[in-house]
Amino acid sequence: MQGRLSAWLAKHKLAHRPLGFDYQGTETLQIKAEDWVSIAVALYVYGFNYLRSQCAYDVAPGGSLASVYHLTKINDNADQPEEVCIKVFVPREDPRIPSVLRIWKGANFQERESYDMLGIFYESHPCLKRILMPESWIGWPLRKDYIAPDFYEIQDSH
């Protein structure tokens, strides 16, 4: 089912795939990593001026990784702000997504956390380094194929 935003993107020939609506009626779209920056700029111009959250998850063991963006269109006289959920899937072997920090400043720590936990590299992020784990940590703890070190290795890493 195509929503209002999907129709607008299609009208402007911006590549995407509608994924339907969530339980609250928020439209969900899939965007390819190589198209993400141009579509992010278009969404900002369209009025999505607030990045409510960005997160990432491991779709399946050995499968792709996903970076998820929840955008909100905020204006002064909106009782119900319009929202959209964007999903960008990348292969786990080379998980690269362009950073949207220059569009939404709130992406800074959120993209860093996704990098730290899942190893998604956000290209052109000015300070992409670990934010929760020590710099010496090896691996990506929230990947489903991650093998946790034993107790003594965890103690030695601090």
UniProtKB/Swiss-Prot annotation:
Q: How does it assemble?
A: NDH is composed of at least 16 different subunits, 5 of which are encoded in the nucleus.
* Pfam families linked: Complex1_30kDa (PF00329)
Q: What is this protein called?
A: NAD(P)H-quinone oxidoreductase subunit J, chloroplastic
- Give compartment(s): Plastid, Chloroplast thylakoid membrane
Native source organism of the sequence: Cryptomeria japonica (Japanese cedar)
Annotated membrane topology is: Peripheral membrane protein
What UniProt keywords are attached to this protein's entry?
A: Chloroplast, Membrane, NAD, NADP, Plastid, Plastoquinone, Quinone, Thylakoid, Translocase, Transport
The principal location of this protein is: plastid
